[in-house]
């Protein structure tokens, strides 16, 4: 899989591309990340990429020329990061993980000239109902969520019971020691009875989801009732 990142701040991604599963995936040639500074495409002699908004208003807007010229040099599904976009979730991550190539456009300042969105972007994505200074942090989160779903990146068994796979949150997990300052691990987990452990974990997933995320609980019930 190839991921193109269009940004004004390529150094944001230097450590990101070296560390943890992203670094390993790149090292083992499971993915390719191509970071493009779209300032390099500006035809302005000072490499300016922003200007005032027609009709007035605060702040500066990213201009169409450098962004479009950069977009036309890369391939794949083209995604703009924007507060107006579809909310990113695990379902979207799964769909994007099936693509051979995607391009993520990181915004800055007051956003993009609307002609970019209307004519050169396939769709917009948002991490949630809050504002970031730029799209770089959102891009990292989205890329991380996508890459870990690719084959041979993470043990498939580890992915099966992860949060959101079936609209249930994950079960509580514990490690040694079994007793820390009187705080004990549930007895069932050290019983060695794998059937009872499996039942306990499923019960905990349902209880936690119902309590913490009633929206996911409703989705889980709909699927469960259809079976």
UniProtKB/Swiss-Prot annotation:
Cross-referenced CDD domains: TrmD-like
Alphabetized InterPro entries for the sequence: Alpha/beta_knot_MTases, tRNA_m1G_MeTrfase_C_sf, tRNA_m1G_MeTrfase_TrmD, tRNA_m1G_MTases_N, tRNA_MeTrfase_TRMD/TRM10
SUPFAM superfamilies from the UniProt entry: alpha/beta knot
UniProt GO molecular function: tRNA (guanine(37)-N1)-methyltransferase activity
Key word Lipid biosynthesis present: no
Entry GO CC: cytosol
Ranges in a coiled coil: none
Protein origin, superkingdom: Bacteria
UniProt keyword Cytoplasm, yes or no: yes
GO BP terms in the entry: tRNA N1-guanine methylation
EC number: 2.1.1.228
Cellular location(s): Cytoplasm
Pfam families assigned to the protein according to its UniProt record, in alphabetical order: tRNA_m1G_MT (PF01746)
Catalytic activity: guanosine(37) in tRNA + S-adenosyl-L-methionine = N(1)-methylguanosine(37) in tRNA + S-adenosyl-L-homocysteine + H(+)
Binding site for S-adenosyl-L-methionine: 107, 127-132
Keywords annotated in UniProt: Cytoplasm, Methyltransferase, S-adenosyl-L-methionine, Transferase, tRNA processing
Oligomeric and partner information: Homodimer.
HAMAP family: TrmD
Family in the record: Belongs to the RNA methyltransferase TrmD family.
Function: Specifically methylates guanosine-37 in various tRNAs.
Name the UniProt record assigns to this protein: tRNA (guanine-N(1)-)-methyltransferase
Gene this chain is encoded by: trmD
């Amino acid at each position: 899989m190839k991921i193109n990142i269009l940004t004004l701040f390529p150094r944001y991604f230097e450590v990101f591309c070296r560390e943890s599963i992203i670094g390993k995936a790149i090292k083992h040639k499971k993915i390719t990340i191509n970071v493009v500074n779209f300032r390099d495409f500006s035809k302005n002699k000072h490499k300016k990429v922003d200007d005032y908004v027609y009709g007035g208003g605060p702040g500066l807007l990213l201009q169409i020329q450098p962004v479009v010229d950069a977009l036309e040099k890369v391939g794949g599904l083209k995604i703009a990061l924007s507060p107006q976009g579809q909310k990113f979730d695990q379902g979207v991550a799964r769909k994007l993980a099936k693509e051979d190539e995607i391009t993520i456009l990181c915004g800055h300042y007051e956003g993009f000239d609307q002609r970019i969105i209307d004519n050169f972007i396939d769709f917009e994505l948002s991490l949630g109902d809050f504002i970031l200074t730029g799209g770089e942090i959102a891009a990292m989160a989205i890329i991380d969520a996508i890459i870990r779903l690719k084959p041979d990146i993470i043990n498939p068994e580890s992915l099966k019971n992860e949060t959101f796979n079936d609209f249930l949150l994950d079960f509580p997990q514990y490690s040694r020691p079994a007793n820390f300052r009187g705080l004990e691990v549930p007895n069932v987990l050290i019983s060695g009875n794998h059937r009872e452990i499996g039942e306990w974990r499923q019960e905990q997933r349902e209880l936690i989801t119902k309590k913490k995320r009633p929206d996911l609980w409703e989705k889980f019930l709909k699927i469960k009732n259809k079976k």
